[in-house]
Regions:
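Switch II (G3) loop of P-loop NTPases
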Residues: 36-54, 72
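Conserved nucleotide-binding/hydrolysis micro-motifs of P-loop NTPases
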Residues: 45-47, 74-76, 99-102, 127-130
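Short gly/ser/thr-rich secondary-structure transition/capping motifs
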Residues: 23-27, 48-52, 75
Length: 140
């Protein structure tokens, strides 16, 4: 299985997505540091939200085969700048989370990740297990 690093803002669903991918119970816990278990690298949202720790994400991304930009389907904004994906020297995919939420805007999330340069976009719901198998198949 390919190693993947998940990047996104706090509360975007990175940790919950990893729990769903592993088949674990969904239990909220705040990620405080870069957590590498199995083939999944979980990152604190604060690393992506601020300027100070972005370099750490870049360094850790070299340990992964794939970079996953995680964007919540209910977000009113996107922390990733347009055309940021080509900076990585590995595939960058977009992962839209919380697609089961009533106020989810899948088209807007897809457009934002396409503007980032993501070559493939997955739509997921960790609660409903939507898109989990598709993402696992991609990573296999």
């Amino acid at each position: 299985m390919k190693k993947i690093i998940f990047m996104g803002r706090s509360g975007s669903g990175k940790t919950t997505l990893i729990e769903a991918l592993k088949g674990e119970d969904l239990v909220y816990r705040k990620t405080q540091y870069i957590d590498y278990s199995d083939n999944f690298m979980d990152t604190p949202g604060e690393y992506a939200e601020g300027n100070d720790l972005g370099g750490a994400l870049a360094v850790y991304s070299y340990e992964a085969d794939v970079v996953g930009l995680v964007l919540c389907a209910t977000d009113d904004f996107c922390i990733f700048p347009p055309a940021c994906a080509p900076v990585a020297n590995r595939p960058v995919i977009g992962i839209v989370t919380k697609c089961d939420e009533p106020d989810a805007n899948l088209e807007l999330a897809k457009m934002r990740l396409e503007l980032c340069g993501c070559h493939r976009i997955f739509f997921t719901s960790s609660k409903e297990k939507q898109g989990i198998e598709e993402l696992l198949t991609y990573l296999a």
